[in-house]
Amino acid sequence: MSGRSAPVVSFSSVDNSLSSLKNCQGYLHTGMDITVSVALDLLETGCESTEVDAMESVMLEYSAMERDLKQYIHAVEETVQKLRREQMEQVPDLQSLVQEKYATIQKKNDDEDLKKNDRFVQFKDQLREMRKQMGEKEEGDAAFENVDEDIAVLPSQQNLTCPITQMEMTNPVKNKVCGHTYEKEAIERMIQDRHQKKKRVKCPKVGCVHSDMQISDLVPDTALKRTIDILNKQKGRH
């Protein structure tokens, strides 16, 4: 009949699949967190550096999977948006179109960029911090020879104190932008409260000039958390 528009292809099933794919990112992040924990365990117990290097390779593999997943999701979203604009009446070969778009995106990949993944960068920082602590312990004077092997060289009490609560941290998170550390619950509450008032959030560390904090900037400070746990373990023995 004239004046009656033809039905447009529905992409609701594609939207559902996209939602499932995005949920997979959480599984990748869990795998990365486990890898970080294993690597720090290996360092703490004095395992060979080759075993720690193997964990670094695992982290790079996770980084590659995360990159590929994000690019595939982007390819699907771009393709679907294009088809929606064209209001197609017949079901296209969506899989072929997505694969073509995905292949185009992947041509620009450089595996060196995997080392810039936020979680991989944080992983390297945590290994560096743990190695620094272990190295300081090994170079200590003879007075420490009989100290329990679980004791690590610990940072000063000031470095364990949250700049917001002024109490020793139990669940520290680090700001990726400025590198300062806070108690997770305290800093997240502070950011949320300020954002609700439409105000920018300045890093609470005295002297820090970073003035636009976001919750997405915060990552677990696993190395410091392990140090705090060791300290508390030692306190419990006395």
From Swiss-Prot:
Zinc fingers (SP-RING-type) by residue: 147-233
Subcellular location: Nucleus; Chromosome, Telomere
CDD domains for this protein: SPL-RING_NSE2
Cell division recorded as keyword: yes
Residues that bind Zn(2+): C178, H180, C203, C208
InterPro entries registered for this protein in UniProt: Nse2(Mms21) (IPR026846), Znf_MIZ (IPR004181), Znf_RING/FYVE/PHD (IPR013083)
Main localization category: nucleus
Keyword line: Cell cycle, Cell division, Chromosome, DNA damage, DNA recombination, DNA repair, Metal-binding, Mitosis, Nucleus, Telomere, Transferase, Ubl conjugation pathway, Zinc, Zinc-finger
GO biological process, one term: telomere maintenance via recombination
Pfam families (alphabetical): zf-Nse
Record's GO cellular component terms: chromosome, telomeric region; nucleus; PML body; Smc5-Smc6 complex
Enzyme Commission numbers on file: 2.3.2.-
Family membership: Belongs to the NSE2 family.
Subunit note: Component of the SMC5-SMC6 complex which consists at least of smc5, smc6, nsmce2, nsmce1 and nsmce4a.
Main function: E3 SUMO-protein ligase component of the SMC5-SMC6 complex, a complex involved in repair of DNA double-strand breaks by homologous recombination. Is not be required for the stability of the complex. The complex may promote sister chromatid homologous recombination by recruiting the SMC1-SMC3 cohesin complex to double-strand breaks. The complex is required for telomere maintenance via recombination and mediates sumoylation of shelterin complex (telosome) components. Required for recruitment of telomeres to PML nuclear bodies.
Listed name of the protein: E3 SUMO-protein ligase NSE2
Gene name for this UniProt entry: nsmce2
